[in-house]
Amino acid sequence: MLIFAEALDVAAEGAVWYCRRIGGGTFEAVHVPSKSTDTGIHARWFDYTGGEPRLDVRPPGSDPTEVVLEKVAALRRDREDVVVTVVLPEQFRKRSLLVAAQRAQFRLKLRLLTEPGVIVADVPAVTSERRPEGHVPDRLILRVLAGAPDPRTHRAIEYAQGLPGVDELRALHFGPRDWNDSELGIPVEDAPLTGRLGDSILTEVRKLTADPATAVNVVLPERIDTGLRRLRGPRAVAIKRCLLFEPHVILSSVPTRA
């Protein structure tokens, strides 16, 4: 696992908690300085994490995408069976899709979606606080969005089943279905599809995050077609937009290439 940390803030606090929870305490972290970087981030990171892991601070002017791809390659060690989760803490002062699309992390996410063996996990926070708040969730619940028992959904479930430290794992399906839970191998929750899919997802997720001690990792099976001008489907984009600023929600994209 790898955290790409822009700052040591509330979002990074959540990312460290998540990595410790599902990574068995073992993960790496990297930082590329920018104009707004806190010059003391290395020391503050050490104090916050106790030195495990140390923050790999790269030289100013380094390309974030190249740095992350280099770290991913080192973690995979040329093994095709190794999956690396890249955790991206993203903190916003306000809910703005325009601001989110202009950030360097947006371009990084698009590039990572095309990288074999990489899962991208967004850990967002909307706050003006510039330091960790000092409290994190106690429970981690996973919901795999399951439209049908197809290869994309099975791959997402396989990834979710391999994550330790999870208190509950289920699939989440909206609307009627003509297949059984046994086709996925995990329990399936059925929820009504009322209006837009994104609104229905938010309704179900908020039932879980109403408990402030609970965080929800929404696992999204995503079809990626690198041969098309439009890399991602409109369904996946709409889901990501509705969850990007949602408190206590982590969004993990599990891409399957067409």
Predicted feature locations:
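Structured cytosolic domains appended to multi-pass membrane proteins
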Residues: 1-253
